Amino acid sequence: MRRLHVALAVDDLDATIHDYSERLGPEPVAVVVGKYALWRTPEVNLSVNCDVAAGERLRHLGFEDDAVSTKSESRDVNGLLWESFSPHWQDEGINRVYGPIS
C-alpha cells in the first residue's frame, strides 16, 4: 500500500489530536504523550509533532510505501522536502526520536 504522507508541526498537540481525529475519523495509531501523534488511513499518513518554537507549519511531504525498504529524501522544484519510507521504518523512527508509543 502507498499513502500520501503529510508531516506538520503544531503548538498544541492535545487540541490537534482531538480536532484531527474528528476530521479523519479514527484516533491516532500512535501517540507519544506531549510530543507526537500519527494517523494512518487508507488515503493518508499524517504525522504531527509538538514544536512550540516552530509554531504551526508544514514540515515535509512524502509517501509511506510498503514496498520501500529504506528511507529516501529529495526536494521538489519548490524546495519542499519529500520522504519515502516503509511503515516499519517510521515506527522505529518514532521510538528513536520521540520515545515509546503509548
Residue ranges of predicted features:
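Core segments of cupin and vicinal oxygen chelate
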Residues: 1, 7-46
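Vicinal oxygen chelate
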Residues: 3-11, 37-42, 51-102
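Short acidic, gly/pro-rich beta-turn/loop elements at beta-sheet edges
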Residues: 17-18, 49, 71, 94
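Short, isolated positions in well-ordered beta-strands
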Residues: 46-47, 82
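A short local loop/turn or secondary-structure capping micro-motif enriched for an aromatic residue
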Residues: 47, 54-58, 89-93
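Short alpha-helix boundary/capping motifs
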Residues: 48-49, 102
